[in-house]
Swiss-Prot record:
Signal peptide: none
PROSITE patterns: LECTIN_LEGUME_ALPHA
Family the UniProt entry places it in: Belongs to the leguminous lectin family.
Organism, scientific name: Lathyrus aphaca (Yellow vetchling)
Binding partners and assembly: Tetramer of two alpha and two beta chains.
Name this polypeptide is given: Lectin alpha chain
SUPFAM superfamilies: Concanavalin A-like lectins/glucanases
Source lineage: Eukaryota, Viridiplantae, Streptophyta, Embryophyta, Tracheophyta
InterPro entries documented for this protein: ConA-like_dom_sf, Lectin_LegA_CS, Legume_lectin_dom
Keywords assigned: Lectin
Amino acid sequence: ATSYTLNEVVALKDVVPEWVRVGFSATTGAEFAAHEVLSWSFQSELSGTSGSN
């Protein structure tokens, strides 16, 4: 079986709104294939002043 790795760092604050949902999609055209997400990582940091809402 062939295996591919995709690794990308994206500054999401530059491309998405404050609230967002993330999903995955894959296709092979007319053929059947199984796609697996073997690892997923997300890191978030809250910026702002202390005590703000």
